[in-house]
């Protein structure tokens, strides 16, 4: 396996360019587990390719770059097992050199090959100044006066979550739309002062799986109508693309695939995703799958020769997570 030198590799010390990864660094494998780098080789590759997926993400490497390839038969077997329990036919990494001469579409024009998304990434537990649920709710619900409002139907749940972390709820007036204003003691913005964040800090995005699920739960309860029961789909909207991209990274680190759409009439970006872990009581998602989701390969195209980096780990398959979407490669 070799990825191009400028590809970003997820490490325990945040993202690193592939050409900056060193022996002894800790990275993450296809199952989201921590593994250690034992070999790094730099070389110039004359035959390089760019792989494009159906969510417009790309990854570049030489012809030896490998993916866990799912074909139509494999996906049919997953459906037969209802995507809940594994079966005997295990996926193996397939190199690009074995794919570049194949058609990526079947006779009906449907995309043939897909790769599974990573499992939730096992970042270490963090010592966070504000509990994840409380922080996520506060960050995306507060007004300029640092007041919050309850969401109709979830007031008792929200109050209980805050109280379970030692916060006293002080209620204000109830609005005509059913929302009630409230503040907390201690005040969250005073706990964070003087550096009050306007976006998700890195230590929250790199917290443990349980902490990130709690963070996402708080964010999804912070506004009304963020879950579409009919489509079993969550959404998060903002006019700030950087904010949406942060939530996208949070969701994808938990194994889900996402998409972002722009509404020019409202000048708003909306993140859409499905999430198999239950974070809202009205959620009707099916059980967790063998693989949380999948990306379809839309194109494999030659690109210019360039420096590449071959990385081996002490894991059983040398898999690592690369780039946006935490794409698993080998």
At which residue positions do the language-model features occur?
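Surface-exposed, non-catalytic interaction/assembly patches
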Residues: 277-304
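Polar, glycine-rich mid-to-C-terminal structural blocks
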Residues: 268-272, 277-280
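Short, functionally important structural connectors and interaction interfaces within domains
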Residues: 10-13, 120-122, 292
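Intein-associated homing endonuclease modules of the LAGLIDADG/DOD-type, together
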Residues: 1, 23-32, 39-270, 295-330
